[in-house]
Every structure is written in structure tokens, then in C-alpha cells.
Amino acid sequence: MASFSIRAARPEDCSDLLRLIKELAKYEDMEDQVVLTEKELLEDGFGEHPFYHCLVAEVPKEQWSSEGHSIVGFAMYYFTYDPWIGKLLYLEDFYVMAEYRGLGIGSEILKNLSQVAVKCRCSSMHFLVAEWNEPSIRFYKRRGASDLSTEEGWRLFKIDKEYLLKMATEE
């Protein structure tokens, strides 16, 4: 059984965070879309006004990965607001390296996130899961998550930077 600890990410973890972000993107067959740099992660998460918060799962040296990594999982989150229900914790990314799955690491990260949400008086935790990612869907549903796309019919949209710039400069 793996021994591990969950802790808040530190600035020196940014290279591991970027590695895990890229691993998650590869798992989702979207690795070409990761353009974020380690420098941006550092500035955006550890400056005076962080845009995100992050928990990491760390294993002791004797359990490091075959590539020599001690950080084996992470959850990136931030706080947002819903005018109907108030404060929310939004889970942006959540990933545990394949060789460390099934050891309770993901459950412990989610438990820690739940404690953060409760402490900050959040009404709920929101997140996205790819439709094809049945293992994750089952993981969340076992813990009480509801699928808003089927239950409430919500659709997710995005406006890319190109169109933001266009709208921002329209007269």
C-alpha cells in the first residue's frame, strides 16, 4: 500500500504541476492544446492575487515513480460565485498518475477539497468530466455528484481570446 500525503502546492512544485497537466491532457487526447508555461503557472498561482489554488499528492522517496517523481497527483481549483446559491469551489483539473490509481489518493484529494469547500462555506463543488471518461464519472457519482448536463440540460460554451479581443475593441 502506498504511503502518501496531500498538501497545498508550493511554488517549487510548478514543474511537476505542468508535467501532470500535460499527462492529463495526453490522457484526454488533447495534449497539443496545453500552451501554458511553468512561468505562467508560477505567476498565476503564487502571486499576490492567485488565480488558482492547488493540492498535490506526494509519496515518499521509496515510492517515487519509475521516472523519479514524488508528486503523483494534483487538483487545481478556484472559487467562483453563483448568484442563485452563492460561493462555489470549481475543480478545474484533477489527476492521479496511472500507476498510483486505486490506492485511495484520488479519494483523499477529493476529501481535502471537500474540507476546503466546507471551511469556505461553499454551496457546492462544480467540475467538468469528458463524456467518454466513464471511470471518472463513476468515481464522482459514487461520491454523490450529479450530472447537470443530463439532469438540468446545461451546455458549456467558451469564447476564445480572438473573439474577446474583437468584442473588447468594437465601437
Swiss-Prot record:
**One Gene Ontology biological process:** regulation of cell population proliferation
Q: What is its EC number?
A: 2.3.1.57
| Pathway where this protein functions | Amine and polyamine degradation; putrescine degradation; N-acetylputrescine from putrescine: step 1/1
Q: Does the keyword Transferase apply?
A: yes
Keyword annotations: Acyltransferase, Cytoplasm, Transferase
- Any one GO cellular component localisation term in the record: cytoplasm
Residues annotated for substrate binding in this entry: Y27, E28, E92, H126, F127, L128, E152
User: Which compartments is it annotated to reside in?
Assistant: Cytoplasm
Recorded hits in InterPro entries, A to Z, give: Acyl_CoA_acyltransferase (IPR016181), Diverse_Substrate_AcTransf (IPR051016), GNAT_dom (IPR000182)
Q: Which reactions does this protein catalyse?
A: an alkane-alpha,omega-diamine + acetyl-CoA = an N-acetylalkane-alpha,omega-diamine + CoA + H(+); spermidine + acetyl-CoA = N(1)-acetylspermidine + CoA + H(+); spermine + acetyl-CoA = N(1)-acetylspermine + CoA + H(+)
Q: Which superkingdom is the protein from?
A: Eukaryota
Q: Which residues form the active site?
A: Y140
Give all residue intervals belonging to the N-acetyltransferase domain.
4-171
* Role noted for this protein: Enzyme which catalyzes the acetylation of polyamines. Substrate specificity: norspermidine = spermidine >> spermine > N(1)-acetylspermine. This highly regulated enzyme allows a fine attenuation of the intracellular concentration of polyamines. Also involved in the regulation of polyamine transport out of cells.
Q: Would you identify the family this protein belongs to, as annotated? A: Belongs to the acetyltransferase family.
Q: What is this protein called?
A: Diamine acetyltransferase 1
Originating species: Gallus gallus
Q: Which gene encodes it?
A: SAT1
